[in-house]
Amino acid sequence: MAIYKSLTEADLLAFSTGLIAGVDEVGRGPLVGDVVTAAVILDPNKPISGLNDSKKLSEKRREALFDEICDKALCYHVGRASPAEIDELNILHATMLAMQRAVAGLNIAPELVLVDGNRSPIFVAHNGAELTSHSIIKGDGLIASISAASIIAKVTRDREMDVLDAAYPQYGFAKHKGYPTKAHFEAIAEHGVFDQYRKSFKPVKALLGL
């Protein structure tokens, strides 16, 4: 597996003329909830305008692109790792597991997997063969399929935080999305933690005296 600091869509021809799956994650930093990943294979005959790193898009634009990706992509799948798995494996290995689940869930086998960041797990096709994969630093702003994956993962996790907010409104999940903000720390200090918290993360461990 190679690591690339810069890559354009045209460069992909050097890797593959077949189907390419882009993979990205969201939710490594929060204290609560799953780490969520997505794998997306775009349809080259149905281009999507405005794809970019999900963090650089407004919520309204992300939501609109989410719907367009779901409608136009050849296939996509969301993979995740639970707080219990994060605590057992650590956040890095849990993220790699979630990425593997995202790719394994695609109903079309890609010939190449491109992952945002500086590392990638081993991906295996349904027939047991290892898939070719490359990691691309800042790939979510360079490669359309990775951008699409970042949007699918981000919108999926944000919606899940909104659901959690409805169940536990005293924590303010709709605003901070589970990240370690001052308001979140204050809510934890007042109300404690529940089973969706990542007990291996230092602020949660400190509160629990672990």
From Swiss-Prot:
<protein>
    <recommendedName>
        <fullName>Ribonuclease HII</fullName>
        <ecNumber>3.1.26.4</ecNumber>
    </recommendedName>
</protein>
<dbReference type="InterPro" id="IPR022898">
    <property type="entry name" value="RNase_HII"/>
</dbReference>
<dbReference type="GO" id="GO:0005737">
    <property type="term" value="C:cytoplasm"/>
</dbReference>
<keyword id="KW-0540">Nuclease</keyword>
<dbReference type="InterPro" id="IPR024567">
    <property type="entry name" value="RNase_HII/HIII_dom"/>
</dbReference>
<dbReference type="InterPro" id="IPR036397">
    <property type="entry name" value="RNaseH_sf"/>
</dbReference>
<dbReference type="GO" id="GO:0004523">
    <property type="term" value="F:RNA-DNA hybrid ribonuclease activity"/>
</dbReference>
<keyword id="KW-0255">Endonuclease</keyword>
<dbReference type="GO" id="GO:0032299">
    <property type="term" value="C:ribonuclease H2 complex"/>
</dbReference>
<feature type="binding site">
    <location>
        <position position="24"/>
    </location>
    <ligand>
        <name>a divalent metal cation</name>
    </ligand>
</feature>
<feature type="domain" description="RNase H type-2">
    <location>
        <begin position="18"/>
        <end position="210"/>
    </location>
</feature>
<keyword id="KW-0963">Cytoplasm</keyword>
<dbReference type="GO" id="GO:0006298">
    <property type="term" value="P:mismatch repair"/>
</dbReference>
<keyword id="KW-0378">Hydrolase</keyword>
<keyword id="KW-0464">Manganese</keyword>
<dbReference type="InterPro" id="IPR012337">
    <property type="entry name" value="RNaseH-like_sf"/>
</dbReference>
<feature type="binding site">
    <location>
        <position position="116"/>
    </location>
    <ligand>
        <name>a divalent metal cation</name>
    </ligand>
</feature>
<feature type="binding site">
    <location>
        <position position="25"/>
    </location>
    <ligand>
        <name>a divalent metal cation</name>
    </ligand>
</feature>
<keyword id="KW-0479">Metal-binding</keyword>
<dbReference type="Pfam" id="PF01351">
    <property type="entry name" value="RNase_HII"/>
</dbReference>
<dbReference type="GO" id="GO:0030145">
    <property type="term" value="F:manganese ion binding"/>
</dbReference>
<comment type="similarity">
    <text>Belongs to the RNase HII family.</text>
</comment>
<dbReference type="InterPro" id="IPR001352">
    <property type="entry name" value="RNase_HII/HIII"/>
</dbReference>
<comment type="function">
    <text>Endonuclease that specifically degrades the RNA of RNA-DNA hybrids.</text>
</comment>
<dbReference type="GO" id="GO:0043137">
    <property type="term" value="P:DNA replication, removal of RNA primer"/>
</dbReference>
<dbReference type="GO" id="GO:0003723">
    <property type="term" value="F:RNA binding"/>
</dbReference>
